[in-house]
């Protein structure tokens, strides 16, 4: 793996990362209740038709068209309930009382909802036109036996798992979780809940990354804070590499910090690239250790979170076998705020996407965009993506926005 100098574009960096990794193949079979957020290892094929029988879409009356042609009231010959179908005789000139989900009796040509009927002394009168097949759910209408319901690579959520259960399937094979070893570096870091020493700050990056990893369904190996010592850092990399598919560090990759980090990484593996043409997030490193992939996040909180979101998230998705993109589609809107920008790097500013008084989408800035201001994520709901060569943006100009996904409480 050749080390690339200079500033690499985001697209080039992401393509470089994704081109090198291959999805995990190890799998395990789990009951559905344990499969939320997991990735299907093989297609789910339906063993049966859904629904498995013709049934009523409404509470009402099952009828034959010939019986209602005269317009006369029809006596009720029986009742059909969900789980208790009607099996008795169905004489000509009568109807069957039927409930939603109940099997329609043999010979039924339509179900008339009860709101379109009138109870008479001598039976039920139908007050609206009746069409053949109305309000009948046909067997296999939703899913037919033998159909691929969900392909391998699908991330399982509450949208998919109940469907699988409706097929009578109790467990499915899923790709094993991606194992990620995580640590922060720096003498200045302190654990939340502990008193701060002179010049110290609390370690927030590791918490943010840990939470995002759990949301993505990873198995997290949290190695804590590693002090600014080459021997300790080398030992941490060796331990992490022995346990994980991906090693993520926070801090230690900026200019002035990176000398011994780079030396250790080159000793233990290879570095693909070190610096990106994005803001925030310029000091991001990617490479390969003996057994795992390495992602070095910047120390500034916004920079660390942004590079994880834009680069590490897609990498983990590919490793896990997830075939869907985790990033919402970008869209063009007008800005209602003036945006400060210096040409030279792709800029991800935090913004608020909302509709104005005319019902049109527009975006406003969350305020100061410093790479240390993590509150911009809680205030915003999108990134304002400003092109590399673009300068300051005036009110009313068109910009590209990318709504936050579920990692930040978005889509």
Curated annotation (Swiss-Prot):
It is an enzyme of class 2 (transferase). The keyword tRNA-binding does not apply. Its EC number is 2.10.1.1. Binds 1 Mg(2+) ion per subunit. GO terms for molecular function: identical protein binding; metal ion binding; molybdopterin molybdotransferase activity; protein homodimerization activity. Keywords: Magnesium, Metal-binding, Molybdenum, Molybdenum cofactor biosynthesis, Transferase. GO terms for cellular component: cytoplasm; cytosol. Its cofactor is Mg(2+). The keyword Transferase applies. It catalyses: adenylyl-molybdopterin + molybdate = Mo-molybdopterin + AMP + H(+). It comes from the Bacteria. SUPFAM superfamilies: MoeA C-terminal domain-like, MoeA N-terminal region -like, Molybdenum cofactor biosynthesis proteins. Gene3D superfamilies: MoaB/Mog-like domain, MoeA, C-terminal, domain IV, Molybdopterin biosynthesis moea protein, domain 2, Molybdopterin biosynthesis moea protein, domain 3. CDD domains: MoeA (cd00887). Pathway: Cofactor biosynthesis; molybdopterin biosynthesis. SMART domains: MoCF_biosynth. Pfam families: MoCF_biosynth (PF00994), MoeA_C (PF03454), MoeA_N (PF03453). GO terms for biological process: Mo-molybdopterin cofactor biosynthetic process. Catalyzes the insertion of molybdate into adenylated molybdopterin with the concomitant release of AMP. NCBIfam families: Glp_gephyrin, molyb_syn, PRK10680.1. Belongs to the MoeA family. PANTHER family: GEPHYRIN, MOLYBDOPTERIN BIOSYNTHESIS PROTEIN. Homodimer. Interacts with MobA, MogA and MobB in vivo. This is Molybdopterin molybdenumtransferase. It comes from Escherichia coli (strain K12). The gene is moeA.
């Amino acid at each position: 793996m050749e080390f690339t100098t200079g500033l690499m574009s985001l697209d080039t960096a992401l393509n470089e990362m994704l081109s090198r990794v291959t999805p995990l193949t190890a799998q395990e079979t789990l009951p559905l209740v344990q499969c939320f957020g997991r990735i299907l290892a093989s297609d789910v094929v339906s063993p049966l038709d859904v629904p498995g029988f013709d049934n009523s879409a409404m509470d009402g009356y099952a009828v034959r068209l010939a019986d209602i042609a005269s317009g006369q009231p029809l006596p009720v010959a029986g009742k059909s309930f969900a789980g208790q179908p009607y099996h008795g005789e169905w004489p000509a000139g009568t109807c069957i009382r039927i409930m939603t989900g109940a099997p329609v009796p043999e010979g039924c040509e339509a179900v008339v909802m009860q709101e379109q009927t009138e109870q008479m002394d001598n039976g039920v009168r139908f007050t609206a036109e009746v069409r053949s097949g109305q309000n009948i759910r046909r067997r296999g209408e939703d899913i037919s036996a033998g159909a691929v319901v969900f392909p391998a690579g699908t991330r399982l959520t509450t949208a998919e798992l109940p469907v699988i259960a409706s097929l009578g399937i109790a467990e499915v094979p899923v790709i094993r979780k991606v194992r990620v070893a995580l640590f922060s570096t720096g003498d200045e870091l302190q654990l939340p809940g502990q008193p701060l020493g002179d010049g110290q700050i609390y370690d927030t990056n590791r918490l943010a990354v840990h939470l995002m990893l759990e949301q993505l369904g990873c198995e997290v190996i949290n190695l804590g804070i590693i002090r600014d010592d080459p021997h300790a850092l080398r030992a941490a990399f060796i331990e992490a590499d022995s346990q994980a598919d991906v090693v993520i560090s926070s801090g230690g990759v900026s200019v002035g910090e990176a000398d011994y980090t780079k030396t250790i990484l080159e000793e233990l593996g290879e570095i693909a690239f070190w610096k990106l043409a994005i803001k925030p997030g310029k000091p991001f490193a990617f490479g390969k250790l003996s057994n795992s992939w390495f992602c070095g996040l910047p120390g500034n909180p916004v920079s660390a979170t942004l590079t994880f979101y834009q680069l590490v998230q897609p990498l983990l998705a590919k490793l896990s076998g997830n075939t869907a993109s985790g990033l919402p589609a970008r869209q063009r809107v007008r800005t209602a705020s003036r945006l400060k920008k210096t040409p030279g790097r792709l800029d991800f500013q935090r913004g608020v996407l909302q509709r104005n008084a005319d019902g049109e989408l527009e975006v406003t800035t969350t305020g100061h965009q410093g790479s240390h201001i993590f509150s911009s994520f809680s205030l915003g709901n999108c990134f304002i993506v400003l092109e590399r060569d673009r300068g300051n943006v005036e009110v009313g100009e068109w910009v590209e926005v990318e709504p936050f996904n579920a990692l930040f409480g978005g889509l």
